């Protein structure tokens, strides 16, 4: 089966699994809540548990596994972009997170899932890891993967994130973005057949010169969305209906609209973030990163 295309929550998929002895999960994730491989993984484990099929995870490095940041998902923002109370950047491998899903009883199962994780050898989450394969066509390299936690939730806004250009997730902009000179024109291609603002000139910010491979700030760069909100004309609706699902909270949109500073925003999600950091410790398979 193509795991990303199968509807693991459907009765049809459950019937298709009949007779299968083992399901193996081997995907390169990026360690961001709204990157939906982990939601697919959770549905897969649930479907397999229903039929008592064991699951084997071949663990892979988390390229954003060296920090934890962002709001913890609130229950009223639950969607395929986030099913469980974890922050945007959760600092765990897929194997570790799967163990947490089971251990915290987050999954909708009647039978305890049979899960085995084949761990990595010598994994050091303090170091930025090189990826053997691109996680997806629009996350082409490690640089875009590192930018993704700070950019991905902007897909719930009026901004283009460069889909349909040579540099998706390395820039962001809008046809009416004010006060900048960088520009790009999204064009349909085999990967992005209907990119936002196709054939229109978008003005905005290029991130390609940032040296995050060497000097990562170890946090979500909130200044990007705060700057973008101030740079789009007020008559243009900035937030779209999916933003709360991306951010995992209804508070962030309101805070930005009310002009909250980065420090004020971080203070709102700090308590739940600290609780998650403690909660995740019991599920770690590898030494934690420093200053966790």
Predicted feature residues:
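Glycine/threonine-rich flexible loop motifs
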Residues: 29-41
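Glycine-rich, charge-decorated loop segments at or immediately adjacent to ligand/cofactor-binding or catalytic sites
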Residues: 56-78
């Amino acid at each position: 089966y193509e795991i990303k295309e199968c509807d693991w929550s459907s009765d049809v998929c459950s019937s298709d699994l009949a007779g299968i002895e083992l399901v193996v999960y081997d995907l390169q994730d990026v360690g961001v809540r709204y990157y939906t491989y982990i939601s697919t993984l959770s549905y897969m484990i649930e479907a397999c548990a229903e039929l008592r099929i064991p699951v084997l995870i071949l663990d892979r490095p988390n390229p954003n596994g060296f920090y934890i940041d962002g709001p913890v998902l609130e229950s009223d923002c639950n969607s395929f972009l986030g099913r469980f109370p974890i922050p945007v950047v959760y600092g765990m491998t897929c194997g570790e997170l799967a163990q947490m899903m089971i251990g915290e009883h987050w999954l909708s199962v009647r039978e305890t899932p049979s899960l085995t994780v084949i761990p990595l050898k010598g994994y050091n989450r303090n170091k930025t890891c090189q990826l053997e394969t691109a996680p997806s066509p629009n996350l082409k390299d490690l640089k875009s993967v590192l930018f993704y936690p700070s950019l991905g939730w902007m897909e719930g806004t009026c901004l283009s994130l460069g889909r349909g250009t040579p540099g998706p997730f390395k820039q962001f902009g809008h046809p009416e973005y004010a006060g900048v000179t960088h520009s790009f024109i999204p064009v349909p291609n085999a990967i992005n057949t209907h990119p936002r603002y196709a054939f229109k000139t978008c003005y905005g910010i290029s991130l390609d010169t940032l040296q995050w491979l060497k000097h990562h700030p170890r946090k979500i760069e909130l200044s990007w969305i705060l700057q973008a909100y101030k740079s789009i004309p007020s008559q243009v609706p900035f937030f779209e209906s999916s933003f709360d699902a991306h951010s995992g909270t209804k508070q962030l949109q309101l805070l930005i609209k009310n002009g909250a500073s980065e420090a004020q925003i971080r203070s709102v999600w700090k308590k739940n973030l600290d609780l998650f950091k403690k909660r995740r410790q019991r599920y770690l398979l590898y030494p934690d990163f420093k200053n966790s």
